[in-house]
């Protein structure tokens, strides 16, 4: 065969989505329920954790999917003397949850996937000692178990080479709570954008910017950067490393692992086209699900007990008597003041 005869065949391997056969894929075959396990090491305001998750397509169209993505993780203790929330060590064990309701769709030639999602995350948190006290062989007192929660929203766009992810995390409910006699903890609002690039079919890298802020004493407003590198070892098994920096948490390095069953629905003949980043993105788990917590160094003081006395003189049978009445005002559990150290 001449070189000219080979050119059309070569072009089909590196051409458009239609040339690659993506247009022939039936999404009902590619978009199915999948579930699996995930785990992560502690990061900037996030715990050591491992759990189970699942992706459930509620409705699959010709070019779209309406879905629920849910996770439940067991949260473990921080490394001793290395707090994930800056000062107070997180103690195990609690169970956090995350749920997303979303819609993803392909453009007309299936070269891009777009998505929108929103949901709710919860995080109970037990507290241990504080790093500064551990170094001095001391201990904080009145350690509390607290509960934080947030609502979240995200936007996605994925092509064969590029991926974009914008997200917002918005704490709700009691966003600041007493952790112990020295520290107050608060859930952080976080807004971010990640831009990723598929280096090879197995390697994916991204760089992101985020802005975080809290309420009152745990404000810690800060701009941050997040670099991520992921490697797909086999179908469904992915390892990742993450490096972040901001003024509140400074540099944090963490790792993550994820395995999903039910991701190999295509036949071997279809496997190459079915596993393109655009088609795979339709069933990937939504990113940025953790309730991020930061603590602040404060002195928790009970309101002082106050005794108020009144004296009244009365005349009884021609004799004067003085009667003293005292009222004591005591502290209630909510009567606490917080002052910066």
Q: Which residue stretches match the model-derived regions?
A:
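Residues that define the transmembrane beta-barrel architecture of outer-membrane proteins
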Residues: 46-52, 91-97, 112, 147-151, ...
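Extracellular loop and loop/strand-boundary signature of outer-membrane beta-barrel proteins
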Residues: 38-41, 76-89, 129-143, 176-185, ...
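Flexible, glycine-rich linker and terminal segments associated
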Residues: 6-19, 177-187, 192, 204, ...
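Repeated loop/turn-to-beta-strand initiation elements of outer-membrane beta-barrel proteins
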Residues: 61-68, 108-116, 161-166, 201-207, ...
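Detector for outer-membrane/organellar transmembrane beta-barrel domains
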Residues: 138-216, 224
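Solvent-exposed loop/turn segments connecting transmembrane beta-strands
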Residues: 41-50, 62, 75-81, 89-95, ...
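Residues on the lipid-exposed face of transmembrane beta-strands in outer-membrane beta-barrel proteins
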Residues: 52-56, 99-103, 153-159, 193-197, ...
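Transmembrane beta-strands of outer-membrane beta-barrel pores
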Residues: 39-45, 58, 72-78, 105, ...
């Amino acid at each position: 065969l001449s070189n000219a005869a080979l050119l059309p065949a070569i072009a089909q391997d590196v051409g458009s989505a239609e040339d690659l056969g993506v247009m022939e894929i039936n999404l009902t075959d590619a978009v199915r329920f999948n579930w699996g396990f995930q785990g992560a090491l502690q990061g900037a305001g996030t715990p050591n954790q491992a759990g189970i998750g699942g992706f459930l397509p509620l409705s699959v169209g010709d070019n779209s999917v309406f879905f629920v993505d849910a996770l439940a993780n067991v949260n473990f203790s921080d490394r001793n003397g290395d707090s994930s929330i800056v000062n107070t060590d997180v103690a195990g064990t609690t169970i956090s949850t995350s749920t997303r309701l979303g819609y993803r769709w392909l453009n007309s030639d299936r070269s891009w996937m777009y998505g929108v999602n929103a949901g709710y995350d919860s995080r109970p948190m037990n507290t241990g000692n504080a790093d500064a006290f551990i170094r001095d062989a001391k201990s904080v007192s009145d350690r509390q178990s607290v509960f934080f929660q947030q609502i979240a929203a995200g936007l996605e766009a994925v092509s064969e080479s590029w991926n974009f992810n914008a997200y917002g995390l918005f704490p709700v409910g009691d966003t600041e709570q007493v952790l112990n006699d020295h520290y107050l903890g608060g859930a952080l609002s976080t807004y971010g954008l990640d831009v990723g690039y598929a280096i090879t079919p197995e390697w994916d890298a991204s760089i992101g910017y985020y802005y975080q802020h809290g309420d009152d004493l745990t404000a810690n407003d800060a701009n941050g950067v997040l670099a991520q590198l992921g490697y797909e070892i086999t179908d469904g098994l992915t390892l990742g490393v993450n490096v972040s920096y901001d003024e509140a948490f400074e540099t944090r390095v963490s790792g993550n692992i994820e395995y999903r069953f039910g991701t190999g629905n295509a036949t071997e003949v279809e496997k190459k086209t079915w596993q393109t980043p655009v088609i795979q993105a339709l069933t990937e788990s939504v990113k940025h699900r953790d309730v991020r917590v930061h603590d602040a160094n404060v002195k928790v003081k009970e309101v002082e007990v106050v005794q108020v006395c009144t004296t009244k003189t009365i005349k009884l049978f021609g004799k004067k008597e003085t009667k003293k009445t005292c009222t004591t005002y005591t502290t209630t559990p909510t009567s606490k003041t917080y002052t910066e150290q």
